[in-house]
């Protein structure tokens, strides 16, 4: 107990080797795993489950009621995985009945200061949200997404793996995997080649993604027809994922269509 401040208010379940600062409030329905650091004046409430080896910085608020007028006190959850860094003044809400009743954050993510994660959001693994990035309800991020600071993302938008969003953008449509988007409203600006070169060992995969991107977004052909054609002819798993993302998009893809 030597790592838990006497000035913390703890009603929930705490794992082994956790360090909890003064003024922290952990309510009765919270479950926290092992080796977590929770800095002073953080509030963790609601039906919140947190894994192992996370660092939650001062004044973060996790699990407070969804900011949704349709929410009327139903039992909904916030689930956070392992090895995440959640910086100062971040706000993360649980889910709502209309969205599966759960907000989920995976492993190895960095949420910088003043980030907001709204109800029913899904964040996968290894994502970075820079300062004051804002995810509205039901947004979904696949692995290795990077979102620049001061960027809001509209409700129900999906952002694909390895995509990067420029700072001070406004994202209103789905952003495919492996791409860069920027602007208000954000549009595709090309491929996230720097990120791909860092993470992909096989150069032929990057070349295949480049070719597919040009066919999809620079050929002037109908987008979904082109995605179907490529999907039927490719064996590359990343190209398949790109095409399937395009075909399954519900909010559309923001790009400048060639004539």
Curated annotation (Swiss-Prot):
Protein localization: Cytoplasm
EC number: 2.3.1.129
Protein name, as recorded: Acyl-[acyl-carrier-protein]--UDP-N-acetylglucosamine O-acyltransferase
CDD domains: LbH_UDP-GlcNAc_AT
Top-level class of the enzyme under EC nomenclature: transferase
Pathway of action: Glycolipid biosynthesis; lipid IV(A) biosynthesis; lipid IV(A) from (3R)-3-hydroxytetradecanoyl-[acyl-carrier-protein] and UDP-N-acetyl-alpha-D-glucosamine: step 1/6
UniProt keyword annotations, A-Z: Acyltransferase, Cytoplasm, Lipid A biosynthesis, Lipid biosynthesis, Lipid metabolism, Repeat, Transferase
């Amino acid at each position: 107990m030597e790592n838990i401040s006497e000035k913390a208010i703890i009603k929930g379940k705490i794992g082994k080797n956790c360090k909890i600062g003064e003024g922290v409030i952990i309510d009765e329905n919270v479950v926290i795993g092992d080796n977590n650091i929770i800095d002073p004046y953080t509030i963790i409430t609601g039906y919140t489950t947190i894994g192992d080896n996370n660092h939650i910085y001062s004044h973060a608020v996790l699990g407070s009621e969804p900011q949704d007028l349709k929410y009327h006190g139903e039992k909904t959850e916030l689930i956070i995985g392992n090895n995440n860094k959640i910086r100062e003044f971040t706000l993360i809400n649980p889910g709502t009945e209309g969205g599966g009743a759960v907000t989920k954050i995976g492993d190895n993510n960095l949420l910088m200061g003043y980030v907001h994660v709204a109800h029913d959001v899904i964040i996968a693994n290894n994502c970075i949200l820079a300062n004051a990035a804002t995810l509205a309800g039901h947004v979904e991020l696949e692995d290795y997404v990077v979102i620049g600071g001061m960027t809001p993302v509209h409700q129900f938008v999906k952002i694909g793996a390895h995509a990067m969003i420029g700072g001070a953008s406004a994202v209103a449509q789905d952003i495919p995997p492996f791409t860069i988007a920027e602007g208000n409203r954000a549009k595709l600006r090309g491929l996230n080649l720097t990120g791909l070169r860092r993470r992909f060992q096989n150069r032929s995969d990057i070349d295949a993604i480049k070719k597919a991107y040009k066919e999809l977004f620079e050929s002037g052909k109908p987008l979904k027809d082109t995605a179907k054609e490529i999907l039927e002819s490719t064996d590359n798993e990343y190209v398949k994922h790109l095409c399937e993302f395009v075909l399954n998009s519900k909010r559309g893809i923001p790009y400048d269509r060639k004539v």
